[in-house]
Amino acid sequence: MSNNDQLNEGRFFSELLKDANPRIKILFDVTNAYVTALNNNHSFEKYVSEYPFEKIECIHVSGFERDGKGTLRDTHSNSLNEEILISTEWMLQRVNPKYILIERDFNVRSIDDVLEDIYKLRGIVHKKKSIL
């Protein structure tokens, strides 16, 4: 198989779900897609463009870190980065998820840290609602 014949991640999921039970849905990890795209020199939008958006039922977001070499790491240890908020907003222009899941595993100093992420996401969701 040549590189041209290889499926990208979005096309892979499209092919996988094409003939699957229609009740099977996707939990889409915005941060993971963003980190993977940028670490492989792609734009987020191009990287996710072939996903079956109609199958996405849940959007998952978390913060990321940059290591000393500039490589992004999906660590769940920071508040939501501005890039993740922008990418989530882009996704919400194309997807109508039933759920949005925030994951924060480390560096939570207080409930206010978590509430800040919730408020940021709420603003994006309200913006989407006003467009509909």
Q: What is each model feature region?
A:
Residues 1-10, 32-45, 110-112:
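Active-site glycine- and acidic-residue-rich loops that bind
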Residues 22-36:
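Short acidic, Gly/Ser-rich segments with clustered Asp/Glu that frequently serve as metal-coordination loops
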Residues 109-131:
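C-terminal helical cap(s) of enzyme catalytic domains, especially alpha/beta-barrels
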Residues 10-17, 48, 56, 85-92, ...:
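Generic structural signal for well-ordered alpha-helices
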Residues 36-96:
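Gly/Pro-rich active-site loop or hairpin
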Residues 19-24, 87-99, 128:
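A structural motif corresponding to the C-terminal end of an alpha-helix
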Residues 1-25:
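Active-site acidic/histidine proton-transfer and metal-coordination neighborhood
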Residues 26-28, 57-61, 98-103:
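Hydrophobic faces of well-ordered beta-strands that scaffold small-molecule active sites
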